[in-house]
Protein backbone atom coordinates (compact mmCIF):
# COMPACT_ATOMS: atom_id res chain seq x y z
CA UNK A 1 0.00 0.00 0.00
CA UNK A 2 1.33 3.40 -0.98
CA UNK A 3 1.01 5.44 2.22
CA UNK A 4 1.54 8.78 0.44
CA UNK A 5 -1.61 8.38 -1.62
CA UNK A 6 -4.05 9.01 1.21
CA UNK A 7 -2.24 11.69 3.19
CA UNK A 8 -3.26 15.32 3.18
CA UNK A 9 -0.76 17.57 1.45
CA UNK A 10 -0.10 20.93 3.07
CA UNK A 11 0.77 23.80 0.78
CA UNK A 12 4.13 25.46 1.28
CA UNK A 13 4.64 29.19 0.87
CA UNK A 14 7.12 28.51 -1.95
CA UNK A 15 4.58 26.42 -3.90
CA UNK A 16 1.91 29.11 -3.99
CA UNK A 17 1.66 31.43 -6.99
CA UNK A 18 -0.66 34.32 -6.12
CA UNK A 19 -2.96 35.73 -8.79
CA UNK A 20 -4.36 39.24 -9.07
CA UNK A 21 -8.10 39.90 -9.21
CA UNK A 22 -9.97 43.15 -9.80
CA UNK A 23 -13.46 43.62 -8.35
CA UNK A 24 -15.87 46.39 -9.37
CA UNK A 25 -17.77 47.46 -6.24
CA UNK A 26 -20.33 49.57 -8.09
CA UNK A 27 -23.81 48.60 -6.89
CA UNK A 28 -22.52 45.68 -4.79
CA UNK A 29 -23.82 45.12 -1.25
CA UNK A 30 -21.01 45.83 1.22
CA UNK A 31 -21.19 42.73 3.44
CA UNK A 32 -21.68 40.18 0.68
CA UNK A 33 -18.86 41.59 -1.41
CA UNK A 34 -16.55 41.91 1.62
CA UNK A 35 -17.04 38.28 2.64
CA UNK A 36 -16.13 37.14 -0.89
CA UNK A 37 -13.04 39.37 -0.85
CA UNK A 38 -11.96 37.95 2.53
CA UNK A 39 -12.50 34.45 1.12
CA UNK A 40 -10.10 35.18 -1.76
CA UNK A 41 -7.54 36.95 0.47
CA UNK A 42 -7.41 33.88 2.74
CA UNK A 43 -7.08 31.53 -0.24
CA UNK A 44 -10.13 29.44 0.65
CA UNK A 45 -11.20 29.37 -3.01
CA UNK A 46 -8.17 27.21 -3.86
CA UNK A 47 -8.07 23.42 -3.56
CA UNK A 48 -4.66 23.56 -1.82
CA UNK A 49 -5.85 25.91 0.98
CA UNK A 50 -3.79 25.53 4.14
CA UNK A 51 -4.88 27.47 7.26
CA UNK A 52 -1.38 28.25 8.56
CA UNK A 53 0.04 29.42 5.20
CA UNK A 54 -0.74 32.66 3.37
CA UNK A 55 -2.08 31.12 0.17
CA UNK A 56 -4.44 33.95 -0.76
CA UNK A 57 -4.50 36.11 -3.86
CA UNK A 58 -4.18 39.86 -4.37
CA UNK A 59 -7.47 41.78 -4.68
CA UNK A 60 -8.00 45.22 -6.21
CA UNK A 61 -11.35 46.88 -5.48
CA UNK A 62 -12.40 49.75 -7.74
CA UNK A 63 -15.39 52.11 -7.45
CA UNK A 64 -15.48 51.75 -3.66
CA UNK A 65 -17.32 55.08 -3.48
CA UNK A 66 -20.32 53.49 -5.25
CA UNK A 67 -20.81 50.72 -2.68
CA UNK A 68 -24.36 49.91 -1.54
CA UNK A 69 -25.68 49.35 1.98
CA UNK A 70 -29.13 47.81 2.45
CA UNK A 71 -31.93 49.33 4.48
CA UNK A 72 -31.14 52.56 6.32
CA UNK A 73 -27.60 51.54 7.31
CA UNK A 74 -26.11 54.41 5.30
CA UNK A 75 -27.59 56.88 7.81
CA UNK A 76 -27.67 54.66 10.93
CA UNK A 77 -24.46 52.59 10.86
CA UNK A 78 -21.77 54.27 12.94
CA UNK A 79 -18.03 53.75 12.92
CA UNK A 80 -16.56 54.44 16.37
CA UNK A 81 -12.95 55.33 17.14
CA UNK A 82 -11.25 56.49 20.30
CA UNK A 83 -8.16 58.66 20.79
CA UNK A 84 -7.52 57.08 24.24
CA UNK A 85 -7.92 60.48 25.89
CA UNK A 86 -10.87 61.13 28.21
CA UNK A 87 -13.87 62.11 26.12
CA UNK A 88 -12.00 61.17 22.95
CA UNK A 89 -14.65 58.94 21.41
CA UNK A 90 -15.51 59.87 17.83
CA UNK A 91 -18.51 58.60 15.87
CA UNK A 92 -19.09 58.94 12.14
CA UNK A 93 -21.95 57.56 10.07
CA UNK A 94 -21.35 55.47 6.97
CA UNK A 95 -22.78 58.28 4.85
CA UNK A 96 -20.27 60.83 6.18
CA UNK A 97 -17.37 58.35 6.06
CA UNK A 98 -18.15 57.64 2.40
CA UNK A 99 -17.71 61.36 1.69
CA UNK A 100 -14.63 61.80 3.92
CA UNK A 101 -12.73 58.60 3.02
CA UNK A 102 -14.57 56.40 0.48
CA UNK A 103 -12.18 53.45 0.74
CA UNK A 104 -12.44 53.11 4.54
CA UNK A 105 -15.83 51.38 4.54
CA UNK A 106 -14.65 48.48 2.35
CA UNK A 107 -11.27 48.23 4.11
CA UNK A 108 -12.91 48.14 7.54
CA UNK A 109 -15.46 45.50 6.52
CA UNK A 110 -12.85 43.18 4.97
CA UNK A 111 -10.37 43.64 7.84
CA UNK A 112 -13.03 42.54 10.31
CA UNK A 113 -13.51 39.30 8.35
CA UNK A 114 -9.83 38.31 8.35
CA UNK A 115 -7.99 36.56 11.21
CA UNK A 116 -6.70 38.84 13.96
CA UNK A 117 -3.15 37.42 13.76
CA UNK A 118 0.16 38.13 12.03
CA UNK A 119 -1.06 35.99 9.13
CA UNK A 120 -4.24 38.06 8.94
CA UNK A 121 -2.15 41.24 8.74
CA UNK A 122 -0.21 39.76 5.82
CA UNK A 123 -3.46 38.85 4.09
CA UNK A 124 -4.84 42.36 4.62
CA UNK A 125 -1.80 43.88 2.90
CA UNK A 126 -2.87 42.10 -0.31
CA UNK A 127 -6.01 44.27 -0.51
CA UNK A 128 -5.94 47.47 -2.58
CA UNK A 129 -9.05 49.69 -2.54
CA UNK A 130 -9.62 52.66 -4.87
CA UNK A 131 -12.51 55.13 -4.91
CA UNK A 132 -12.55 55.61 -8.68
CA UNK A 133 -12.41 53.27 -11.65
CA UNK A 134 -8.64 53.71 -12.15
CA UNK A 135 -5.96 51.71 -10.35
CA UNK A 136 -2.17 51.49 -10.63
CA UNK A 137 -1.79 47.71 -10.92
CA UNK A 138 -2.13 47.20 -14.68
CA UNK A 139 1.38 45.70 -14.81
CA UNK A 140 0.16 42.72 -12.75
CA UNK A 141 -2.55 41.99 -15.36
CA UNK A 142 -5.42 41.47 -12.91
CA UNK A 143 -8.34 39.41 -14.11
CA UNK A 144 -11.93 40.33 -13.24
CA UNK A 145 -13.34 38.28 -10.38
CA UNK A 146 -16.72 36.69 -11.06
CA UNK A 147 -19.01 36.34 -8.04
Predicted regions and their residues:
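Short, highly charged C-terminal tails/helix-capping segments
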Residues: 129-137
Amino acid sequence: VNTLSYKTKSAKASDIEPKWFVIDAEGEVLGRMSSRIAHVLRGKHKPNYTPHVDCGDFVIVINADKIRLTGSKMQQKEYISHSMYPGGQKRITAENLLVKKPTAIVENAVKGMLPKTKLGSRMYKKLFVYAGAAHKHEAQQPEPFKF
